[in-house]
UniProtKB/Swiss-Prot annotation:
Species this chain originates from: Photobacterium profundum (strain SS9)
A GO term, aspect molecular function: lyase activity
EC code: 4.3.2.10, 3.5.1.2
Lineage: Bacteria, Pseudomonadati, Pseudomonadota, Gammaproteobacteria, Vibrionales
PANTHER family the record matches: IMIDAZOLE GLYCEROL PHOSPHATE SYNTHASE SUBUNIT HISH
Gene: hisH
Involved pathway(s): Amino-acid biosynthesis; L-histidine biosynthesis; L-histidine from 5-phospho-alpha-D-ribose 1-diphosphate: step 5/9
Reactions it catalyzes: 5-[(5-phospho-1-deoxy-D-ribulos-1-ylimino)methylamino]-1-(5-phospho-beta-D-ribosyl)imidazole-4-carboxamide + L-glutamine = D-erythro-1-(imidazol-4-yl)glycerol 3-phosphate + 5-amino-1-(5-phospho-beta-D-ribosyl)imidazole-4-carboxamide + L-glutamate + H(+); L-glutamine + H2O = L-glutamate + NH4(+)
Gene3D superfamilies hit by this protein: 3.40.50.880
Listed name of the protein: Imidazole glycerol phosphate synthase subunit HisH
Length: 210
């Protein structure tokens, strides 16, 4: 079990409401720092990368705050949440209102970010849904099968197959998509664990105790 004295940092991207993530971590007994300073980020034991809005706006924010290369230098466990998970991918279809080209993201995970094809189901995918994690992954330890998590999104990473197997949990909403990923020390969840009741709290606890 990791110590609650470890350095926990939420990266200050300028494109996220970090309060709910901070409170969820503090409820578990940890002290949280919100920062974009190089020394603070690189000395952290665990990091969170939250995000809201569009991929194009978020990447612009990261560039303006000199965070793109900094995030790539992180060698400790980092958890991207919602848009923060998508930013870990390669190219996003979510360009914003005036964009026509794919948005280059951090490319820490070799995955595209595509608009969900939901048939008659409405977009965004908003509300509670179940996920199917891979067996015995530590991020989902102690979380009962069939647990619900809270989603708000219109874009997602496909479920991975083959050599670049990044999917560690999947969800179904008109089509299967990656609900959680791992690429080395970078983790991501498409749902909001900080808004997902006991299951979400357990997931955050698991991440902090890795």
């Amino acid at each position: 079990m990791a110590s609650t004295n470890q350095k926990v940092v939420i990266i200050d991207t300028g494109c996220a409401n970090v309060s709910s993530v901070r409170f969820a971590i503090e409820r578990l007994g940890y002290t949280v720092t919100i920062s974009k300073e190089t020394s603070v980020v690189l000395n952290a034991d665990k990091l969170f990368l939250p995000g809201v809005g569009t991929a194009s706006e978020a990447m612009k924010n990261l560039q303006e705050r000199d965070l793109v290369e900094l995030v790539k230098q992180v060698d400790k466990p980092l958890l991207g949440i919602c848009l923060g998970m998508q930013l870990l991918g390669a190219l996003s279809e979510e360009q914003g209102q005036n964009g026509k080209e794919l948005v280059p993201c951090l490319h820490l995970c070799d995955a595209p970010i595509k608009k969900l094809k939901t048939g008659n189901l409405p977009l965004p995918h908003m509300g509670w849904n179940t996920i199917t994690p891979i067996d015995n992954h530590p991020l989902f330890q102690g979380i009962p099968a069939g647990s619900y998590f809270y989603f708000v999104h219109s874009y997602a990473m496909p479920v991975s197959t083959g050599v670049n197997d990044y999917t560690i949990a999947q969800c179904e909403y008109g089509q299967p998509f990656s609900a959680a990923i791992q690429s080395g020390n970078y983790y991501g969840v498409q749902f909001h664990p900080e808004r997902s009741s006991k299951a979400g709290s357990q997931l955050i606890k698991n991440f902090l105790e890795m």
